[in-house]
Amino acid sequence: MKTSLFKSLYFQVLTAIAIGILLGHFYPEIGEQMKPLGDGFVKLIKMIIAPVIFCTVVTGIAGMESMKAVGRTGAVALLYFEIVSTIALIIGLIIVNVVQPGAGMNVDPTTLDAKAVAVYADQAKDQGIVAFIMDVIPASVIGAFASGNILQVLLFAVLFGFALHRLGSKGQLIFNVIESFSQVIFGIINMIMRLAPIGAFGAMAFTIGKYGVGTLVQLGQLIICFYITCILFVVLVLGSIAKATGFSIFKFIRYIREELLIVLGTSSSESALPRMLDKMEKLGCRKSVVGLVIPTGYSFNLDGTSIYLTMAAVFIAQATNSQMDIVHQITLLIVLLLSSKGAAGVTGSGFIVLAATLSAVGHLPVAGLALILGIDRFMSEARALTNLVGNGVATIVVAKWVKELDHKKLDDVLNNRAPDGKTHELSS
């Protein structure tokens, strides 16, 4: 029993995170030097994301009987994303207005260090809807894979899958090669995941060593408010959606606990993307649905980021005593419904989109970003965890709506009645 516990990735990552926190707190200078360990692990994961998405989407689409099903899946997924992300934005807006974590700070915007957020404000100027749509189209296929742009790779994979499907029996050889290549890629993922504890340790040691617990205490009310809101969203909103779909959100969270710990350690939801593609398929969702919903969700279904954006914007308004009446808040909500979709594939995307939103709204000081710059890193864990759970739930819901979900397999796996790889007939 003890041997199996020590070999568990869940236990190893949890232990590594704890050691990283202790090292960063008591030996901050050494903790800061651990940054390459976390960065290296995330880079290894990002290295493999593009080929994983390509193989999963191509084999999923090419193996489908009807191409109409692909279009239906995409439309249903986008509808779900828009509804749930809107709910997340509204919940964030309500909670921050009720708790008012920024009230009483009385910060003069002219005293804030605008230089500290200048880089985010500059990048925000390019984050328009048209620019976002144009960025989905790659200048070259090789460039899409080289840059690791998820949406560009996804677009090419969908087109490739459609073309391969139209070839029929002539494309069988190519299909078999890609499927075999996919097995090799997932073998590489298994090897990389053995390094997850090292990556989690390095990332956590750096975070605590660099920013310290003092930053947490200074703006702790906003952090606590944000974490509680994310928990309520997962338990109440996603939990209700899960119950209506026929599964328990708590059993699902237990099923993806290793992926959640990896995300907690690295603060990057992308670090769990390859494993999520595999685990959602093993849970009973059709490969074509998983291949479309998970990668697209990383751009259009960022529930945690949506909550963060509304709370951060209103917090800055409260702290700087900027006017935020009902009209301003509705305007903020409408702007965020559009601007939040431009966060895909951008480093520091939350901050960039927030800067773009503050600029678009007009009456909120962009320099106010400096207030939360120091604690943003501590809130990124909750954002990433909520995003991951949200995309997992979305995959199951969409699979059910388009009748591509194996209900028996879902129930068996979540209740530990069947091994992950066992298959059943699709239910209608």
From Swiss-Prot:
Keyword presence, Membrane: yes
Membrane topology: Multi-pass membrane protein
Cited InterPro entries: C4_dicarb_transport, Na-dicarboxylate_symporter, Na-dicarboxylate_symporter_CS, Na:dicarbo_symporter_sf
S-S pairs: none
PROSITE patterns reported in the protein's UniProt record: NA_DICARBOXYL_SYMP_1, NA_DICARBOXYL_SYMP_2
Entry keyword annotation includes Cell inner membrane: yes
Subcellular location, principal: membrane
GO annotation, biological process: L-aspartate transmembrane transport
NCBIfam families in UniProt: PRK01663.1 (NF002461), PRK13027.1 (NF009587)
Annotated function: Responsible for the transport of dicarboxylates such as succinate, fumarate, and malate from the periplasm across the membrane.
Similarity-based family: Belongs to the dicarboxylate/amino acid:cation symporter (DAACS) (TC 2.A.23) family.
Protein name: C4-dicarboxylate transport protein
